[in-house]
A protein has these predicted regions:
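Phosphate-ester processing/binding pockets and catalytic centers
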Residues: 1-253
Length: 253
């Protein structure tokens, strides 16, 4: 059985975020989860002062920008990037697939009429579309590479998207809904993604911290951040997506 841990980036921040991204990691529950958790504990022990280790959670955005716990005064850029590199190396180290879906905000008019929706409704519709793209990549991987297994999705606990994600996944598993709404999509209805989507806090699930790292790096890559290259290159060999990873540039989106 696989557990797919995912997080989102760019939601509810239309002024500064040109993309909404949902990214995650597909973890073999029996073979990979415990070694993954133990490795994150080792990174906490290696990088974080003893008094701060209990319940510590890595956040990629804080590491990248130097905010909150990782403030720039106490955590120089070189050290923060070292920690980020250690986190980004985890998927390849443990042979854990990485996947994602994204939506570019300026293309939303193709399927959303902003005149009929308020700002929050537009954001949630964008999230729903992005979630479909992400789940489709997960379903593709499960059918093609792990066809004798199932996966359950576990997302970062965010009250704002609970209902949207649960309803979307219910639709994507319903043959009648798919037949009426999206009959030409190859990996719908879902067969290997089972149950409803579940949610947890990063403090409760160490694997979600890796989903956070992957999602942040992929978003920065989409934004053509000139400094994200080494971190993205660490993830790229583990990418399982419908879109070729080398097409991950702003111009191709």
């Amino acid at each position: 059985m696989r557990l797919t841990y995912f997080d989102d980036a760019g939601l509810f921040n239309a002024q500064q975020e040109p993309f909404i991204v949902i990214g995650g990691v597909i973890v073999h529950a029996d073979a990979q989860l415990i070694p993954l958790e133990e490795h994150i504990d080792r990174l906490i022990h290696e990088h974080i002062p003893e008094g701060d280790r209990t319940g510590f959670v890595f956040h990629a955005m804080e590491l990248w920008h130097g905010g909150r716990y990782f403030d720039r005064e106490n955590w120089p850029l070189q050290k923060r990037l070292e920690i980020l590199a250690d986190l980004a190396a985890i998927p390849a180290k443990f042979d854990i697939p990485v996947s994602f879906g994204y939506q570019k905000r300026e293309h939303a008019w193709r399927f959303i009429d902003p005149a009929k929706l308020n700002t929050r409704e537009v954001e949630l519709q964008l999230y729903s579309d992005t979630y479909a793209r992400f789940c489709e990549s997960i379903e593709m991987f499960m059918r093609e590479a792990a066809s004798d297994e199932i996966t359950v999705l576990i997302g970062e606990d965010n009250d704002a998207i609970h209902a949207v994600a649960k309803m979307a996944q219910q639709h994507y598993r319903d043959p009648n809904w798919v037949k009426e709404t999206a009959p030409l999509l190859t990996y719908f209805p879902f067969e290997r993604i089972r149950e409803s989507v579940h949610f947890a806090k990063k403090s409760e699930s160490k694997a979600l911290q890796i989903a956070d790292t992957c999602t942040f790096i992929i978003k920065r890559r989409l934004m053509n951040d000139p400094h994200i290259g080494p971190l993205y290159e660490a993830l790229e060999p583990m990418m399982v997506v419908l879109l070729k990873p080398e097409l991950l540039t702003e111009q191709s989106c």
